[in-house]
């Protein structure tokens, strides 16, 4: 990374986490699960003419070193090049417009605005710490997004950071469809909440370790794959922006209004990617944005989320989130 023009600092931090859980209950269950997570966090910082720009990325999954060895060099080159290019980029002009969002950005959007509100304890108001409300409380069976929006949680996706076989209530994991064609169908449930919602436990009850009570937690919540080529999604945009890679979220207590900054963006003009944009924030409200989605790509990707806090006292958890490239309408503005 340091050989790239204008790069003044680069960091690569590889690490692994081992996790062993032994579960026994009065129903006769005896379950031992062992997992190893391998992760590498990288950041490249460029500085020139009084302007500093940084781009970071995290790669990893549940498995062996091959999960990061195959991606780390390519990702390191990409973030170094982007940080260098951002030195000459301009801040974005504030406007409400068409946005094409790449899978990395979509993964954080999914995590914050679709995943957490799908945890049934938050829907019921039983876990309100850390923006613990749910913007779709009481709306099961109602339309909350466009027919292009399909969302699921799936702890069985192998090699994702949300992959496991049984939760901390001894419930076997499975894929749970949360939203189908824009209709809210279900929440992530534990044994208690499933009775309230006339549902079944979904295998999402997890604790950070033995010292904490389990909470309903995302495993691998994603927007489902679409059938459109990404180039075609961009080509259909007359005026808009291509939003790349997650940065920092800000949400209200019900996760209704949200803003998420991205690492960088590109202007779309008459179906072509043009000028690089820096310091970009994307803002919207949940129902308006999700109803505006008119395209989902065929490039489904699961990204690593290495830190998620929930509860009081707060518990941290790692998980996967993802989706394909999506297109919708929201507001962009510059940080500065």
PLM regions and their residue ranges:
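N-terminal small-residue-enriched
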Residues: 1-336
